Design a protein with these regions (language model features):
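Basic, flexible linker segments flanking DNA-binding modules
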Residues: 1-16, 88, 96-98, 111-114, ...
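Extended, low-complexity cationic-aromatic segments
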Residues: 1-42
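Active-site beta-loop-alpha junctions of metal-dependent nucleic acid enzymes
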Residues: 20, 27, 33-37, 51-75
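Short, surface-exposed connector motifs at secondary-structure boundaries
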Residues: 75-81
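RNase H-like polynucleotidyl transferase catalytic core
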Residues: 81-86, 101-119, 135-138
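C-terminal domain-tail junction helix/linker
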Residues: 100-104, 126-172
Length: 172
């Protein structure tokens, strides 16, 4: 799960001339909030599933997991294990119930050791540099509207060095 600050209407300060403050942000009187980018990556194929949700609560994460499992099942992927960090949303009872309900073994990374979950961490970095901050967006809705197109590119067109220059979809 990666948190991204929302883009204000009219565009954010990242691409503004002189990197000028726009008057919105965490310390302003009108904060915009964040989008919680919930991410699932298939270990073998690197097929990615992402949703932008409003929070990272256990109930929200469990709902995301159900939708991610349906996505992977539709692609012919059988999920046997899930590797997560130790966030409270992944340690919640409702999240554990969903994994048990689907017969999935839940494994957690060592605390303060993000390298253990390297594929997801690397995907988060790619998502930031190639989609979220790749160009100026005029609003948060515009940025989120481009997410499905970027995921299609990532899953079906982009070649991955870690899997022999293949696309994730070709490894299913």
């Amino acid at each position: 799960m990666k948190k991204l600050g929302r883009v204000p209407d009219g565009g954010g300060k990242r691409f503004a001339p002189g990197f000028k403050e726009t008057g919105v942000g965490p310390r302003s009187k009108r904060p915009l909030g964040i989008d919680c980018m919930h991410v699932a990556i298939d270990d073998h194929s690197r097929l990615a599933y992402v949703e932008a949700l409003n929070d990272e609560k256990g109930v929200t994460t469990a709902g995301f997991l159900k939708r991610a499992l349906a996505f992977y099942l539709a692609k012919g992927v059988t999920v046997k294990r899930i590797l997560t960090d130790n966030g409270t949303n992944y340690r919640s009872q409702v999240f554990a119930d969903v994994t048990r309900e689907h017969g999935i073994r839940l494994k957690r990374t060592r605390p303060y050791r993000p390298q253990t979950n390297g594929k997801a961490e690397r995907f988060n970095r790619i998502l930031q540099s190639k989609w979220a901050y790749s160009r100026r967006f005029n609003s948060n809705a515009e940025r989120l509207a481009e997410l499905p197109d970027y995921l299609d590119y990532y899953n079906y067109t982009r070649q991955h060095g870690g899997i022999g220059e293949a696309t994730p979809a070709s490894r299913l």
